[in-house]
């Protein structure tokens, strides 16, 4: 259930709310624009205060995020806080819109990005954290993929100061932290093991190293830096000198840098000052200007999107439909009746439908067709989706796909975990239901019968958009929550989108790729 269904969102003067672009346990983020000037796009974060208090947070805890992010908003790689206020049940924060979307929505699991892209984002993250530590005295304490966004030119924007803390006092002395906070794979070992406390700024440096590893390999080195985790223990025993698994993909120069950062003893860990002098940080990326910002968004997008691919091959299809070990990558405990994933009418996302339909209408009216060619409706739809990077990731002809990508490259907030289909619902839903079951996601049986009941109640024209809320666990045992939305764009053309709410973006993309492969026969692919 969305927060707006629990309590109506407050009205914000002169601001028009749009789609929900993110949602967590006690907060949601919507895009918005100014009423007087729709060209000025914003993001509004709504924090549900009663839910926060149920989770044990005080008023000071709730407002601390605003205080610290406001203090840290004068750096180009930190998401800027514009305004905030409190209503009866919500605290709302107006932020600049990261209109390039999520960085890790664009990274292929188990592949990562090429060295130039990793270097560029590593440099920008180091710059942002250096600003936080040196000029603001603030440690972020939750550096992870979910909190790395992009602007319209592809520049990194560090977001979410919910766990941040002021580690340096006004007199220059450093506070010692005692609490365990952060996301397990990105957490520094001293957060778990230090009995005398730790310095929060040093834990940020560790998290930067883990994020760099993920950029280079498309996976985390371990689930938790714990002595119970064999991957982490192996790393410690070999003093970071590893050449197997994902470590074997990393060039020697980058391995050397990672070993300096991922030093379990925080007193031996490289400092930010030393990190800024590393050759990989000093050498400018090919699409980076003197100010460290992207000066060639098209080249950056080309490099970033080039590794995105969903293979619908027979080999992958057989692996996902017949291999028991593959099917068990995602774990789902036996749910009680009301936890079964089921098909519902999504009354909260009318705006999303309107935007998608407007995109097609705009494309349709701006496209000149040669009446002599007699272009079919299906050909028109296929041409329309060729403007969406999400559709191109299924293309089997790499050269043809690269040409399409070059024509339509741009950063935008649209999710890439999506496919299009022309299949009727009596074909689409049984195949989707099969894919969910094979992914160990428990579904209320017969999605199509449920769809027919909704049609009787609402009528076919009013039944869309549809939503299936899903909950599962990754191989590491961490929760993945999100939804699958089915949106009717025009007549038979529909989009099937996978929206992550909580959990690792790379694990969510793995799940999307698996379900898409099982649904391969219904996916519309540009050709």
From Swiss-Prot:
Gene Ontology MF, one: protein serine/threonine kinase activity
Domain Protein kinase intervals: 15-281
The organism's place on the tree of life at top rank: Eukaryota
Keywords annotated in UniProt: ATP-binding, Cell cycle, DNA damage, Kinase, Nucleotide-binding, Nucleus, Serine/threonine-protein kinase, Transferase
EC number(s) given by UniProt: 2.7.11.1
Catalytic center residues: 142
Localisation per UniProt entry: Nucleus
Reaction catalyzed: L-seryl-[protein] + ATP = O-phospho-L-seryl-[protein] + ADP + H(+); L-threonyl-[protein] + ATP = O-phospho-L-threonyl-[protein] + ADP + H(+)
PROSITE patterns named among the record's database cross-references: PROTEIN_KINASE_ATP (PS00107), PROTEIN_KINASE_DOM (PS50011), PROTEIN_KINASE_ST (PS00108)
GO terms classed as biological process: DNA damage checkpoint signaling; mitotic G2 DNA damage checkpoint signaling; replication fork processing
SUPFAM superfamilies named among the record's database cross-references: Protein kinase-like (PK-like) (SSF56112)
Keyword Iron annotated: no
Pfam families: Pkinase
Group of enzyme by EC: transferase
Annotated ATP binding sites: 21-29, 45
GO terms for cellular component: cytoplasm; nucleus; site of double-strand break
Miscellaneous remark of the record: Present with 2530 molecules/cell in log phase SD medium.
Family in the record: Belongs to the protein kinase superfamily. CAMK Ser/Thr protein kinase family. NIM1 subfamily.
Entry function: Serine/threonine-protein kinase which is required for checkpoint-mediated cell cycle arrest and activation of DNA repair in response to the presence of DNA damage or unreplicated DNA. May also negatively regulate cell cycle progression during unperturbed cell cycles. Controls phosphorylation and abundance of PDS1 to prevent anaphase entry. Also helps prevent mitotic exit.
Protein's recorded name: Serine/threonine-protein kinase CHK1
Source taxonomy: Eukaryota, Fungi, Dikarya, Ascomycota, Saccharomycotina
Gene: CHK1
């Amino acid at each position: 259930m969305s927060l707006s269904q629990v309590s109506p969102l407050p009205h914000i003067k002169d601001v028009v709310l749009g789609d929900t672009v993110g949602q967590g346990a006690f907060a949601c983020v919507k895009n918005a624009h100014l009423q007087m000037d729709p060209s000025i796009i914003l993001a509004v974060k709504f924090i549900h205060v009663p839910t926060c208090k149920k989770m044990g947070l005080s008023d000071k805890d709730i407002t601390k995020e605003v205080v610290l992010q406001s203090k840290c908003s004068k750096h180009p790689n930190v998401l800027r806080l514009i305004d905030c206020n409190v209503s009866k049940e919500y605290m709302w924060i107006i932020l600049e819109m990261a209109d390039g979307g999520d960085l890790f929505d664009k990274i292929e699991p188990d592949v990562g990005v090429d060295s130039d892209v990793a270097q560029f984002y590593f440099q920008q993250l180091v710059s942002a954290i250096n600003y936080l530590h040196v000029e603001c005295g603030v440690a972020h304490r939750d550096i992870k993929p979910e909190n790395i966004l992009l602007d319209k030119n592809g520049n990194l924007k560090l977001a979410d100061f919910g766990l941040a803390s002021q580690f340096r006092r006004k007199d220059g002395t450093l506070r010692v932290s005692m609490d365990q906070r952060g996301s397990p794979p990105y957490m520094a070992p001293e957060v778990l093991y230090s009995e005398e406390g730790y310095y929060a700024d040093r834990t940020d440096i560790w998290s930067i190293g883990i994020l760099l590893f993920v950029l280079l390999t498309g996976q985390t080195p371990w689930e938790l830096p714990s002595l119970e985790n064999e991957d982490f223990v192996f790393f410690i025993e070999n003093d970071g000198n590893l050449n197997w698994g994902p470590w074997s993909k990393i060039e020697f120069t980058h391995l050397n840098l990672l070993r300096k950062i991922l030093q379990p003893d925080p007193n031996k860990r490289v400092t930010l000052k030393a990190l800024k002098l590393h050759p990989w940080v000093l050498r400018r990326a090919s699409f980076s200007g003197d100010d460290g910002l992207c000066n060639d968004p098209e080249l950056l997008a080309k490099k970033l999107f080039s590794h995105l691919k969903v293979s619908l091959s027979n080999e992958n299809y057989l692996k996902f439909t017949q291999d028991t070990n593959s099917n068990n990558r995602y774990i789902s405990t036996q749910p009680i009746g009301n936890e079964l994933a089921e098909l519902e009418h999504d009354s909260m996302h009318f705006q999303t439908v309107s935007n998608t339909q407007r995109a097609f209408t705009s494309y349709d009216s701006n496209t000149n067709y040669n009446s002599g060619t007699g272009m079919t409706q299906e050909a028109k739809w296929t041409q329309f989706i060729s403007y969406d990077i999400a559709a191109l990731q299924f293309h089997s002809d790499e050269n043809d796909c690269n040409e399409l990508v070059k024509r339509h490259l741009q950063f935008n907030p649209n999710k890439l975990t999506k496919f299009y289909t022309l299949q009727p619902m009596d074909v689409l839903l049984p195949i989707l239901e099969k894919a969910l079951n094979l992914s160990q996601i428990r579904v209320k049986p017969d999605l199509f019968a449920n769809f027919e009941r909704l049609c009787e109640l609402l009528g076919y024209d009013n039944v869309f958009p549809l939503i299936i809320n899903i909950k599962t666990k990754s191989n590491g045992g961490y929760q993945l929550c999100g939804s699958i939305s089915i949106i009717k764009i025009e007549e038979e053309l529909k989009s099937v989108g996978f929206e992550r709410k909580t959990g690792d973006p790379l694990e969510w993309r793995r799940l999307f790729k698996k379900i898409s492969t099982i649904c391969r026969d219904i996916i519309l692919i540009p050709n």
